[in-house]
Regions:
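Extracellular glycan-interaction patches encoded by glycine-rich segments
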Residues: 23, 213, 220-250
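C-terminal tail/sorting-segment detector
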Residues: 4, 527-545, 586, 598, ...
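Self-processing/autoproteolytic domain segments and adjacent N-terminal interaction modules in large
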Residues: 276-376
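Short, surface-exposed loop/turn motifs with a glycine/proline- and acidic-biased composition
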Residues: 495-519, 588-619
């Protein structure tokens, strides 16, 4: 089965018995019981109702909740959908909201409670209304309400002062407005956080205090959450990259870990007194990805078991003292062993991906030692693994190389596909680590798709190439094409090698793309019938008007006008071929008949077709999509 280059299948059961259960929420804090909403623009943004991944510039219809609660944010009205923009913030995508279009999204069915912890990563381009809204939480059906008494929680920015503020409404109906304290600059991203605690509602900007108000800890229902709007018409004008909500007030150690995860991911610097993770800095290698951590402020504010969205789980620190943290992230290297030569003697391969650790005090000013820790790797999707072959590789001298190290043995299967090394003492501030194997045959490393590209050729065709690093029980690939990201058809089905541990290249041609924008995606099918879709690629084909065909409309319900330069007096053979290459319609017409009339294809089944028009040994080809009437 295939895993794309920059992701890894994670299948672990989360049980809420804090802190003993795996913490798979943002930064490795919480799980679906407490982390009740989690929207990241790098995960699950669709241009339709959850089927077609959005491409840059496309409108976002659905934004999937990755908390596990299924509270997906949606916008059914096409005119009010924000744009998905790739690579906009530290290489990560954002949703771009336009206030003039009243762009907004709505998440419903959130398991709310009387306490809450909320984060938003955002920036504004302008503040066109008195208080443009980032979030508005309310009871079912009230998330877009302009009635102040129904806005049970929220976060917005004053256009008069550019300061962030918000509110919470208690169950007795008392509205508690957070005082304004911190101004936000135009076009500058921030990590914004509101804590709804037992005795106060407090806001933070990049972890620094940004206003507070007394409260009795009885926040009213916020089962619905408006994103990008408040008060119905006060819309956000700018980018939102991530939204996180907990139905508890997380402790101070957890709050710092979550904020550190967001700051590293989006390339922001926290206030100097709280920058506990340094490995995201360019000079230290940009270990920005899937950051998670453990830490302790005091005995009532600690977090000792974390995993987050990555495959690494660290727990059970033996010497974690007050005001101490261990935070880690990775370099986004491939989860595969091909082409990696930096291994110690006796190790046959290692992950290209490496992790790096910060062990710092709570103010980020000095190194600390949290003691020995347990380090586990979830190898779901790897296939058979013999734990005796696994080696934890630690760059203990911090010289950037693993070849001069000795791998740590002793891995054992905990459950499922989770393999753990207990009481590891080699990890310290700034140290890198990764996972290796002494037998690539018996314990391989994961399957990955290395690349998938689509490029136009000089003769207005499209060449599609993809490369795999390894394959396990792979049956075939299907290349699919669409003119509109809604109607997809097969360009080609290609038999796969099946099982391989070397680089394998594949290539097909699309002989008849549309003039203009074309969308392509790759579908992989296992021998057991399981399928996986890989990200969409786009190609623009210029229309020269001579040797290609255009159809109006396209897609069509069956009545089609052909646009092409043809000899009006010559006889032309018009043929329509389905995806299997079978001719389903043919007739002879003069050029004048062809250009003046309408082809009636209403009796042809819906699907993707190639039309050939031949005359005097010359052939013109075009792609036509027929829809059900």
């Amino acid at each position: 089965m295939f895993t794309p280059r920059h992701s890894f299948a994670l299948v672990v059961t989360s049980i809420f018995v804090m802190p003993l259960a795996a913490q798979t929420g943002p930064g490795g804090v919480g799980n679906s019981t407490t982390n009740v909403l989690w929207l990241g623009a790098d995960h699950g943004v669709f241009s339709d109702a959850g089927l077609t991944p959005a491409v840059s510039g496309a409108n976002a219809w659905q934004w999937n909740d990755r908390s596990g609660n299924g509270s997906n944010a949606m916008q059914a009205m096409a005119a009010q959908r924000p744009n998905y923009i790739s690579g906009a913030l530290n290489g990560k995508p954002v949703l771009r909201f336009t206030a003039a279009n009243t762009d907004r999204m709505l998440a419903t069915g959130i398991p709310s409670a009387n306490r809450a912890s909320v984060w938003v990563v955002a920036r504004y381009s302008s503040l066109p209304s008195p208080n443009p809204g980032l979030l508005q939480g309310a009871a079912t059906g009230d998330a877009y309400s302009a009635t102040p008494a129904l806005k049970n929680m929220g976060m917005w920015v004053s256009s008069a002062t550019t300061q962030v503020w918000g509110r919470g409404i208690q169950t007795d109906g008392t509205s508690r407005n957070v005082t304004m304290a911190t101004a936000l600059a135009t076009a500058t991203p921030y990590v914004l956080n509101t804590m709804y605690r037992q005795s106060a509602i407090s806001q933070y900007v990049n972890h620094g205090p940004a206003g507070s108000v007394a409260s009795n800890g009885t926040l009213r229902s916020w089962t619905d959450m408006a994103i990008g709007a408040q008060a119905g018409t006060e819309n956000w004008n700018g980018d939102i990259a991530e939204v996180i909500a907990f139905n508890v007030d997380v402790n101070e150690a957890q709050r710092l870990i979550i904020t550190s995860y967001l700051a590293a991911k989006y390339g922001m610097t926290l206030t100097a007194s709280t920058d506990v993770y340094r490995e995201d800095q360019p000079a230290r290698g940009n270990y920005d990805h899937e950051v998670a951590g453990i830490g302790r402020i005091n005995s009532g504010n600690l977090h000792t078991d974390a995993r987050g969205t990555g495959i690494v789980r660290i727990s059970n620190p033996t010497g974690l003292g007050n005001n101490e943290f261990m935070i880690w992230g990775h370099d986004n290297g491939v989860l595969g062993a091909w082409g990696v030569g930096d291994v110690p003697s006796g190790v046959e391969g290692r992950f290209q991906r490496t992790w790096r650790v910060s062990e710092r005090n709570g103010s980020g000013t000095s190194s600390v030692d949290v003691g020995a820790v347990d380090i586990a790797f979830d190898l779901t999707g790897l296939g058979p693994v013999d734990p005796a072959h696994l080696r934890l590789l630690v760059d203990s001298d911090n010289d950037g190389s693993f070849s001069d190290e000795t791998g740590v043995e002793g891995a054992y299967l905990v459950s499922g596909a989770l393999y753990r090394f207990d009481a590891v003492t080699l990890i310290s501030d700034g140290i890198r680590f990764t996972l290796g194997t002494t037998d690539l045959g018996a314990t391989p490393l994961p399957v990955e798709l290395v690349s998938f590209t689509a490029e136009p050729t000089s003769d207005a065709q499209v060449r599609l190439d993809w490369v795999t690093a390894t394959e396990v029980d792979n049956d075939r690939f299907i290349v699919e094409h669409s003119p509109d990201m809604e109607h997809w058809s097969s360009v080609a089905s290609v038999d796969a090698v099946g099982n391989s541990t070397t680089l394998i290249s594949y290539s097909v041609m699309d002989p008849a793309p549309f003039a203009g924008l074309n969308y392509y995606r790759l579908r992989q099918v296992d021998v057991n019938g399981m399928e996986e879709l890989f990200p969409v690629r786009t190609v623009t084909i210029e229309q020269d008007g001579r040797d290609r065909l255009l159809f109006q409309p396209n897609p069509s319900s069956g009545l089609v006008k052909v646009q092409a330069l043809v000899d009006p007096f010559a006889t032309h053979l018009v043929s329509l071929f389905d995806g299997m290459g079978r001719c389903v319609h043919t007739r002879s017409m003069t050029g004048s008949e062809l250009m003046a009339g309408t082809l009636d294809l209403t009796k042809v089944p819906p699907g993707a077709y190639l039309m050939h028009i031949e005359c005097d040994g010359q052939r013109r080809t075009g792609r036509l999509q027929l829809l059900t009437e």
